[in-house]
Regions:
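Conserved HGGG/HGGXW glycine-rich cap/lid loop of the alpha/beta-hydrolase fold
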Residues: 12-64
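Hydrophobic, aromatic-rich cap/lid helix
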Residues: 2-4, 165-194
Length: 259
């Protein structure tokens, strides 16, 4: 698996890494919990027919600046800057988990910035009748099974690769968790349901049928709230980060929607 081209942009004066690979029309990817400490097979599949641009959210691996973001509005505006500076304004956008919530915000608040939209188990809603789990309150040994149907997929994501700096790597992983918590703790509820009706982009909502973090029933809540043409698909044998569990199936569904 060849590596992407790495560039850096500044958001609020702090560096954010941008990975680019592939050919064809642009598609952006905002990663879920854990971010992108490494390039993924899922992104390689997309890159066969698309130019994949994957910017790191503030605080995620390859980026800093999350400690300057004190409100949800701060985060939304930072992501808007990131989308612009990564060259993704007007492009199709895929967002997963916490990245999915921000992708939805972009489509709602800045509709001209998003072409077609894919949301993979996005954060942003909360139903006290079917509460989401709190990923920041879990023991380390529980977390892999909460993130993926196959916990080994999560472990592989966060395990230092050969040659990684043994000091820097765990700091980046901890910082990614802290950044997501700053944006979404404790329950991931940003009142996004109030803004879903502003989304006019054609939208695909994907959800792993074994998501132990966000109930799969939330997919219908998103579909019901979004104003644009919306379709829901379930990914079999996949957990919260379905693109780790089933990269080929998720990539096929994404590419079919993007056309």
């Amino acid at each position: 698996m060849s590596q992407p081209v790495t560039t850096t942009v500044e958001v609020n004066g702090f560096p954010c890494r941008v990975w680019t690979k592939g050919k064809g029309p642009k598609v952006g990817f905002l990663a879920g919990l854990g971010g992108l400490p490494r390039w993924l097979p899922f992104l390689d599949k997309l890159a066969e027919t698309r130019t994949v641009i994957a910017p790191s959210l503030p605080g995620y691996p390859g980026a800093t600046g999350h400690t300057e973001l004190d409100s949800h509005l701060d985060w939304v505006l930072a992501v808007r800057q990131l989308i612009d500076k990564a060259g993704l304004a007007g492009a199709d956008l895929v967002g997963a988990s916490v990245g999915g919530a921000f992708a939805a915000e972009m489509a709602a608040i800045f509709p001209a910035h998003v072409g077609r939209l894919v949301l993979i188990a996005p954060f942003g809603l909360f139903d006290d009748q079917e509460p989401a789990a709190d990923p920041w309150a879990q023991r380390r040994d529980v977390l892999p099974g909460l993130m993926c149907a196959d916990g080994d997929k999560w472990t592989a994501l966060v395990t230092p690769p050969e040659g990684a700096n043994s000091v820097v790597w765990p700091i980046e992983m901890s910082r990614a968790s802290e950044a997501a918590a700053r944006a979404f703790w404790p329950l991931g509820n940003t009142r996004l349901e109030k803004r879903l009706g502003l989304i006019a982009a054609p939208t695909l909502v994907l959800w792993g049928d074994r998501d132990s973090l966000l109930p799969p029933s939330y997919a219908q809540k998103f579909a019901k709230g979004i104003n644009g043409a919306t379709r829901v698909e379930t990914v079999p044998e996949a957990g919260h980060l379905a693109y780790l569990d089933q990269p080929d199936a998720v990539a096929r569904a994404v590419l079919a929607h993007l056309g």
